[in-house]
Amino acid sequence: MTEFQDPFLKSGEPVKFDKKYIDSTIRPGDIGIADQWAVKPVSDPFVGNLETPVNSGYFTKAFINNLPFYRSGISPNFRGLEVGAAFGYLLYGPFAMTGPLRNTDFALTAGLLSTIGAVHILTALFVLYTAPGKDPNVQPSDCTVENPPTDLFTRTGWTDFTSGFWLGGCGGAVFAWLLCGTLHLDTIMPIVKGVWAAG
């Protein structure tokens, strides 16, 4: 056997497929399922943004375009309020349940203060994003987001988004703190705290 010969071929002859595996109705010029699932560039092939079945599928486009950041018809302040409320609400749990004070009576309050601190840090980063004096980077339309919000990518829009994010983040953290402090969750809280117990 030579070094260029395929070891899976018998005696160097090409493999012959059985007729039952060959579909004779498909012609080479037909546009079929292979072309439908082919990966193509969105606009400029040198940018590196490719249109794949994942990012151009119906479910992905519907999900991404309904997120508060890309949803059409809402103001930048309301976008920031929704995004901040989700961040504040979701960050509260890990800070309260896995923080250093998780086994004390101050676990819920420490989680609240930690979450508000994290929201302040994220808000400071949003402020620093436009601090050099230029407008935020405008995202061009692509196969997933066909109409990105133009009012968000201005200095005024980004400032409104940042203030809404701060208010929503602090409000989401306070709401999660109030929810975890109710009597209805008193039976569940020791179980959740016991999952991450160190001792």
Swiss-Prot record:
Is the keyword Coiled coil in the record?
no
Keyword field contains Membrane: yes
Transmembrane spans: 81-101, 108-128, 165-185
The protein's UniProt keywords, in alphabetical order, are: Membrane, Photosynthesis, Photosystem I, Thylakoid, Transmembrane, Transmembrane helix
One Gene Ontology biological process: photosynthesis
Write down the membrane topology.
Multi-pass membrane protein
GO cellular component annotations of the record? photosystem I reaction center; plasma membrane-derived thylakoid membrane
Q: Which domain of life is it from?
A: Bacteria
- What compartments host this protein? Cellular thylakoid membrane
Give the record's family classification: Belongs to the PsaL family.
Name under which the protein is recorded: Photosystem I reaction center subunit XI
Q: Which organism is it from?
A: Prochlorococcus marinus (strain MIT 9211)
Upper classification of the organism: Bacteria, Bacillati, Cyanobacteriota, Cyanophyceae, Synechococcales
